[in-house]
C-alpha cells in the first residue's frame, strides 16, 4: 500500500497543476418559436353523427353555459378493435368541439406521423371556456389554446408553444 501513496500524490498534484476541470454537458439552444399573435378562428357548423369512415376514439363530455358539450377525437374505423386504437406509424385524427346545439368546430383534421394529439378542457377565472390542443409528434410539439367566443359562435385559438425540429422522447401520461 505504501508504494502506491507517492505515485497517487504525484498524479493528483499533476492534475491540479494542469487545470483539470469538470466536464460540462452540451445543451443545444432551444428551437421554440415565439407564441403566435395570429388568431385561428374555427366557427361552429351544423354536423351530425360520426365523420365518414371514422370512429369515436375518445371524448370528454362536460357542461358549460347550461348546455352539454363534448370534445371528441376520431380515428379511421378500421384502426379500432374492441374499443382500442391499433396505432400505426401514421394515423388520421379529427378533433372537434361539439356544442349543446350539435354544432361542431373542427380543431384538427389531418394525418399525424408518429403521434397522437389530445385536448384538455378548462374554464378560466372569467368563466371563459378553453380547449387546449396538444399536437405532439416525433419532431414537433405544438400547443394551441382555443377560447369559445359566444358572440361569434366560434373557437378562437392562439399558438402557445410551437417547437419543431425536436426529438420528442415521451410522456408520463397513460
Task: Describe each region flagged by the PLM.
Residues 16-19:
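C-terminal motif of bacterial Sec signal peptides marking the signal peptidase cleavage site
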Residues 1-4:
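Positively charged n-region of N-terminal signal peptides that target proteins for export
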